Amino acid sequence: MIVTYNWLKEFVECDLSTQELGDLLTMLGLEVEGVREVGGGLDQVVVAVVEERRKHPNADKLSLCKVNNGREILDIVCGAQNFTAGDKVALAQIGAVLPGDFKIKRSKIRGEESCGMLCSERELGLSAESEGIMILPSDLPLGVPLFDALGLKDTIFEIGLTPNRADCLSVIGVAREIAAKLGKRITYPGHAVVESGEPVTQKATVIVEDPELCPRYTARFISGCSIGPSPAWLVRRLEAVGMRSINNVVDVTNYVLMEYGHPLHAFDADLLENSTIVVRRATDGEVFTTLDGQQRTLTAGDLTIRDGARSVALAGIMGGENSEIRDTTTNILLESAYFNPSAIRRTAKRLGLHTESSHRFERGADVAIVTRALDRAAALLAELAGGTVAAGIIDVYPTPVSHRTIRFRVDRCNALLGVELSANEMKALFHHLEFTTVTVEPGIIDVTVPTFRVDLEREIDLVEEVARLNGYDRIETTMPRARVFSDRPTKHQRMERRCRDLMVGQGFNEVITFSFMAPGALDRMMLGPEDGRRSVVALRNPLVDEQAVMRTTLLPGLLEAASRNLNYRSLDLRLFELRRVYLRVEGEQLPNEPLVLAGLMTGRRYPEGWNQEKHPLDFYDVKGVVEAVLDAFSVSGASYSSDDTDVFYHPGKSCTVKCGDLILGSLGELHPDVQDNFGIDQPVFYFELNFERLLSAARAASAVVPPSRFPDTFRDIAILVADETPAADIVRCIDGLRIREIESAAVFDLYKGVHVPEGKKSIAVRVRYRSTEKTLSDDEVSPLHQKVVDSLVAKLGATIR
């Protein structure tokens, strides 16, 4: 934000030096990033008069001039053609240093001596462009420094504002802060509007179809305007704050924008169909040409200003080429409105169109100042463009905004800041900020915040206001009063750390992905319309469309991370993430947020090495990782059942992980189409476990059992079972016998083919026996083994081979 000292002084009485004012603003939280003096160091540029002008003898385009500076008459060579003898001009005398470090010296130009230079506005830093030298008013005294004579000496402050301080995006806003700090009252500009003629309602009609995005829309009608250049004072004031003069009408809207901080827009009323304004959302795919001549494609979420037939402006951002102010414009419809900040931000960001107007609406304009800014601009247009303001004002304001009231505790504020201010002292500070207060009871105040302070919502915000206005430098340094507790992790945190250590120990790298995802990510996962993970929590104002909803699964984030790494030629990946997902609960305001452990594997089983075979990962590798996790948390009795519920897995190459009736998660190879959708062209294996359920299924640590001192013995069984019988059912059947001497049972061979009937498979199981009391003999093992065989035959329909 750029402000000038002279402009600030119009609203607040202030005699601080430039340095003092800069320090004051910075201590108020308005950081001064730069200070520039206008006219500083230009005391050698004075008012002079051209006594004589004649042609240069050696150059057709140069003139020899006799110039009187009030003390002496100097010879000056000048190339400008826009002056005559008798004109008062700006003379840069010998020794003057102009902007750009241009030093004026005595010189000879085409053989003639020149003892100075007649200056243009551009050469003095008063304008970006100029034609010829400055011609000054005839009543200015000779020899007086130019910037003193014209009152142009000024100081420009460049202020870096934080996004929450929308109220300071104006000269009045900054002046209000200065007045509050100095304990003075701000003087607002007068804006008495002289109205005449027909009422405005007979000149124009305004319809707001979307009051949610446009809570307030006001307008005035000014007829008989004459478009032309703005007066010098207005041009210079705009240029001082970095704005280019266009014409008197546009300059007035820009002037009020910088003065009040509220954007306005002027339409050529004769170009509006039926003199009608309709505020509504754009048609999806609509093409609209803005003032900069660019064609922009709109969406149904963009708010537009339309006339009776077409869009004429992008609400709060930029006007349209089809209704702009032209040299022939005579009748003007002047708009002053309040638009929803989120809607303006989304449209401006999507279109890549950032303007002074959108900058202010995005941060939150003042809905209460709409008519004041409108009247100020209308009064200036009547004065500077000769317009006639129609009687009345159109004000569409269906639901007036109420002032926010915040409960404030004096003791709490003192405790937080380490100060000792009384309630009356704090109330005085609030009154300086134009807040109103009501004492509810001793030490408790209800503070009503004006609408221009959209950033104040909670008690702590008011505490900050007290700190700012009372002075950060008045807060004494004290030791914090706090009880120190040891930072012991909770049991849940210890389990999370243990899980991460386990995954790293298995060769995985932890990744942290965004908690948001694109809605299209679920389509790329091929989830069906009835899948609960499609019921997402949407963000009201996402930063980007790719992060518009909260994630319901960790898979998209891991796949995108894998895709990026594969593009970098990291072909062997093991990634995991232990984070929350967000599942919408019907009838609940907040989603369920379970903690989920997910892992992704792709590439080779072992790192590249001279002694390692290049075995690719397969289903059993990812299953082994899940088994290791379950073992680490002492989850016993886990089962793996084939299940094609999750369509993002390869059919027949996935399973559901259960502990009893509790579903812990799933694992398997991803569907090739899902891999393609994420730009991956090699097999990917994935698992996902609900960490909360995993912990609930975990057993308490069991007592240490010393290993047996006696040798083991084993027996192998080869059986035929149905093709769909999981091998895990065989092991589970043996474990279910609860025979104390059975140490372990494991499948070591699987065979299908010759001598095995269709629909059957041959599985070999090794059962290991051991006693903790003695060495088992064959006679003791045989009956135990027979029980195993009988159980397999009875429960699984197995045939012994």
Swiss-Prot record:
InterPro entries according to UniProt: aa-tRNA-synth_II/BPL/LPL (IPR045864), B3/B4_tRNA-bd (IPR005146), DNA-bd_dom_put_sf (IPR009061), Fdx_antiC-bd (IPR005121), Fdx_antiC-bd_sf (IPR036690), NA-bd_OB-fold (IPR012340), Phe-tRNA-ligase_IIc_bsu (IPR045060), Phe-tRNA-ligase_IIc_bsu_bact (IPR004532)
Compartment(s) of residence: Cytoplasm
Annotated B5 domain residues: 401-477
Chief localization: cytoplasm
Pfam families assigned: B3_4 (PF03483), B5 (PF03484), FDX-ACB (PF03147), tRNA_bind (PF01588), tRNA_synthFbeta (PF17759)
Broad EC category: ligase
Entry GO terms, CC: phenylalanine-tRNA ligase complex
Superkingdom to which the source organism belongs: Bacteria
Residue ranges of coiled coil: none
Signal peptide range in chain numbering: none
Required co-factors: Mg(2+)
Keywords: Aminoacyl-tRNA synthetase, ATP-binding, Cytoplasm, Ligase, Magnesium, Metal-binding, Nucleotide-binding, Protein biosynthesis, RNA-binding, tRNA-binding
Molecular function as annotated in GO: ATP binding; magnesium ion binding; phenylalanine-tRNA ligase activity; tRNA binding
Binding site for Mg(2+): D455, D461, E464, E465
Cofactor binding mode and count: Binds 2 magnesium ions per tetramer.
Sequence ranges assigned to domain tRNA-binding in this UniProt record: 39-147
Single GO BP term: phenylalanyl-tRNA aminoacylation
Catalytic activity: tRNA(Phe) + L-phenylalanine + ATP = L-phenylalanyl-tRNA(Phe) + AMP + diphosphate + H(+)
Domain FDX-ACB: residue ranges: 708-801
EC number: 6.1.1.20
Entries under SUPFAM superfamilies matching the protein: Anticodon-binding domain of PheRS, Class II aaRS and biotin synthetases, Nucleic acid-binding proteins, PheT/TilS domain, Putative DNA-binding domain
Keyword Lipid metabolism: no
Oligomer and partners: Tetramer of two alpha and two beta subunits.
Entry's family note: Belongs to the phenylalanyl-tRNA synthetase beta subunit family. Type 1 subfamily.
Name of the featured protein: Phenylalanine--tRNA ligase beta subunit
Lineage: Bacteria, Pseudomonadati, Thermodesulfobacteriota, Desulfuromonadia, Geobacterales
Gene that encodes it: pheT
